[in-house]
Each structure stands twice: as C-alpha cells, then as structure tokens.
Amino acid sequence: MSGEGMTAVSEPVQLTVPQMLAQLQGTDTSLRYYAAWWLGKFGLETATAAERQAIVSALIAALADEADRTELGGYPLRRNAARALGKLGDRQAVPALIECLRCEDFYVREAAAIALGQLGDPRAIAPLQSLLEGGVAMARLVPGRPHLVQPVEAVIESLGHLGATEAIALIEPFLAHEMPRVQFAAARALFQLTGDAVYGDRLLAALNSEDVQLRRTALLDLGAMGYLPAAEAILQAGVEASFKLIALHGILGQQLRQAAPAEQTLSLFQGLDQLL
C-alpha cells in the first residue's frame, strides 16, 4: 500500500536511565519533577549497579531542593523524590528521609513518612513517633488547609509496617480521632502490632459505611493487613471490583507468606476468580 496521503506514525520514545538522571539534575522544574517520578517507577528495571547508585544519590540530593516551590511554599520535587526513594528500597535514603520529617511542607513530611515505612528501617521509629507527640489534641486541621498539622495517618501506618510495638500507647488514642481515615489507620497499625482481632473487626464493620470512600479505605486497609476473616465481606462489599482485587491480593500474599493451610488460600483464589 502506498504511503501517499498517510500520516507518518513516529516510534515511541524509549526513555533511559541516563536521560532521566540528566533531566533530574537539570534546571527545568517540570522535567525534574517527572524524572523523579519516572526513576522511582521504572529506574531499576534496566539500571546497572552504578546507575542504581546514581539514581539513589540524585534522588537524595533532590530531597534538599530549593528551586521547585509553589506559591504556598510547598516543595513538589522533594515530594516526588521521597516517594521514589520509598519505592526503590535502598536504605541509604533513611537519614535524608528522616530529616524530611522536619520539612515545613506537610506533603513532604507525609511522603517521607510513607517512604520510611516502605524501607523498613527501625532507625525511623523514634523520629516517626515524634510526629505523634501531643496526641489527638494536636492532630487537627490547619485553618484554611485540607490537611492536619501532621501527617498522622501516614505516620501511624508506617509505624505498623515497622513493627513498632513501643508506639502502641501513642497510637491507641487515635482510634477516637474525629476523622475516620485516621481511626482506620490506627486500627490497621494496632492489628499489625498486636494481632488482636478486635482491630480487624473494627475495620470490617466499616465496610457497611454509607460513604463509599470510607468503604474503599477500610477495604484496602483490611487487604494491606492481610485480615483473612474479611475475605467474604470484601467480596460482598459495595465497592468496585478493582478495589476488591487489590484487597484480596493483599490477603492472599499475607497468607502465602505465613504458609497458611491450602484450603484457606484456595478460597482466596476462588474469590479472585469471581472478580476476573
């Protein structure tokens, strides 16, 4: 067939680690922001050992960036760099991420708290606990802003991931916080830290909430903590199938790690089949 009159279709651009590293270290703030995201998501797929080290080093440096600031004083590049470092799994980033917990930008603190939970380094426990000082009375909305004074939801979840049993007394009062999402985070973490089913059942009851967003949040928390008694309720919950799949995958992964009896894992596989 002749090519006359047809529009040429260009080949998709194949981005590379060296290109993205150069972009991250450039001067265009929007390109740097994108590069941080890209390196966190795709950077390790093709990177050499030397490139992996360069990625981590460049992202750690980006945590101290001063060039990319919003009108309200936020640091978008720092946020993306923290998120990327959490995904990359290199504990070299822990000291710099701990320092980010002191950043004036709420969303940098939140991203750093999540990343520290993902990295699983116990050095983060005490600094994370410090953000809960003042308890529920401190955890109030900032006037005129859509967030609390501190990212307590992210902090509590990360303390659960880190197995920080020393934080149980700090976390327990947040079960009575005015925001359901914070209550859910506390229940999830306390289940992870104690194994007490009362916390899992609290989230299970939230699947009956009239608010679909709260149902989604509770469902994902149940999946993340691997709460097997919730499997059937998750299948019946009034949320989209995509959320149910994520939650059941989480429970299945936890059961496989614990070498659960075959009949339990089989029922989870059957539940997943129903959703596919």
Curated annotation (Swiss-Prot):
A GO cellular component term found in this entry reads: phycobilisome
Tree of life domain: Bacteria
> Which UniProt keywords are listed?
Antenna complex, Lyase, Phycobilisome
EC numbers, comma separated = 4.-.-.-
Which sequence ranges are marked TM in the entry?
none
Lyase is among the record's keywords: yes
- Respond yes or no to whether keyword Lyase is given for this record: yes
> In the record, what terms sit under GO molecular function?
lyase activity; oxidoreductase activity
The record's note on quaternary structure and interaction partners says: CpcE and CpcF associate to form a lyase.
**Role, per record:** Required for the chromophorylation of the CpcA gene product.
UniProt similarity note = Belongs to the CpcE/RpcE/PecE family.
Write the protein's name: Phycocyanobilin lyase subunit alpha
Organism, as annotated: Thermosynechococcus vestitus (strain NIES-2133 / IAM M-273 / BP-1)
